[in-house]
């Protein structure tokens, strides 16, 4: 028990019988080692579930399909095909376009809401936040399905408007289109925008706003010169948190996209399903990952710049 | 908070906007239960009349019960394991100085952002190369990866708001590590644990994309629904089933959020 206070804190982790061993002694002394030991089961699962699959996926992307098996001679053919055949580039471009529009729409629509809760709600803030984020935690599939019910050829909007006599024939652009995918994505990912926006707005020192008012800024100038720049990190985080996951979305374009709204995720799924070209699917996944990594770096850079401007 | 002066002035347009926002957020989902009570095989206006027959039909379907049982089994196991892993991860992250900690946290949080389809196909490839057949266990592994970030994110604030001197006091008073954990640490993080269990269960219960790639012959509930979407005549019973799932999910998540936050605000205040 002599070394109990070695780390400056009373030891509450290591159980007494193991203290005699040399390994235990080392663990007892080194905070880092103990921390890593404690977190190791979690890391082990993450390794089995994320790192190993990614390595195999990377290996597979250099193989070629051969009948029902694989030709395991490494080759760049899949990557060359993705680079040269226009369909892949077009699909990637469309995916980024659709999720880009959805991202901008979501952030623009959610900003006033986050602003309202951060500055104008004084009681039950927690309830408001729970209310705004609650749908997000429930079944993604069913929320997308709900939009199919609404936008369908005989869906809520079309049949409702026709029953009211507002339109004569169903509006066909609603279902199986990029518009449908964008609307649905914007709705489904709202919570991912609300939370970072709210956090960054809530952090703003209210006295800065009063200072701006005292110095003669009107509400608009005050917003543009104080609130908006200070909330920029939240805006960037919101864009990142929506744009990245939606580029690879599968369910929404599958249920609502139709041929015009198909995205890269659907194409990847096809390679593992009907087309049965797993190496190609692996290559597409890796290419998508590389794009995501590149975009993440851009966002990181933007965040750094926004932070630097504030402080 | 009390120093806001002009900010206290209510802003009418913003209030109206907030109300509309909430309505738009919730109404689409509400159409599912609305049409599940509609006495027509077609999902369209005008409504034909109220009925419970779609729910009754659901009750007699063997595959629905099987899928429910599969989902519950996977959900419970995933919730327990991911919460345990979340507790030890949150504990390690907050309690010890570890180099590379922020990289570690980023790594754990990765599944939050990276499209699920990539994890799904990557796991599928790994399992098939290793010759492991697709079963509920593989679905569970996929769900574990998806749920872990949420467990850690729920539990981290608990451990961050936790004063280490409490544990030191307990140790000084003669408790050993084990009892200190059970009598001091655990009660203080308990609400976070409950919230994490509820949340991860719901996420696993509702999860689709991982199950889509990793399900063998036993479908989970979302997979069962996906299979039924091809048949227009099944639409009303899918709506009834979806309503029930949404109802349960909303209650569980609301409880999780409520339990997860209430105590947190109290610890911050004190």
What are these regions, as identified by a protein language model?
Chain A
Residues 86-119:
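Transmembrane alpha-helix signature in integral membrane proteins
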Residues 3-11, 18-21, 26, 198-209, ...:
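C-terminal transmembrane helix and the adjacent membrane-cytosol boundary/short C-terminal tail
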Residues 50-86, 150, 154-155, 257-259, ...:
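Short membrane-interfacial helix/loop motifs at transmembrane-helix boundaries
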Residues 29-34, 66, 79-88, 250-300:
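Interhelical loop and adjacent transmembrane-helix boundary motif
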Residues 41-44, 48-51, 130, 134, ...:
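Transmembrane alpha-helices
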Residues 2-6, 12-56, 126, 130, ...:
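N-terminal signal-anchor/first transmembrane alpha helix
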Residues 24-28, 76, 144-186, 220, ...:
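Membrane-interfacial helix termini and adjacent extracytoplasmic/periplasmic loops
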Residues 53, 57-60, 142-144, 189, ...:
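Non-cytoplasmic
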